[in-house]
């Protein structure tokens, strides 16, 4: 699978808005639930890339039924509705929006599957302005650029330094 190219000259320093949070899409459902309930604020130093979800499909980010909603905020209420554990949604309706998250961090190949702009839009309308992943699917890079979402490849610790791919 082709990964987005990185332009080393495009490094920028970004800051988290005071009071906003970073959400980590971990492989551990309990850590996800605790973050969504506001019981846990993880840091990059707490996790390895192997602890993060890989191959997050756009169909999981916004299932087809969620895409029939017209208003972006309605689509955002169902962000990640396709991720289930024992046939139950891991992300309750509106949970990502209500969590006060501004950054979302995941593993390899985020956004694989169908080219679905609503996947990125659901994050953006949930308050996410920065997506960090070990790698992104090419279609997700294009959708993120179109939606004006800042993307960074490879989770990097310290000083808020992120590397931004160009689509």
Predicted segments, located by residue:
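Fe-S-dependent hydro-lyases/dehydratases of central metabolism
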Residues: 1-167
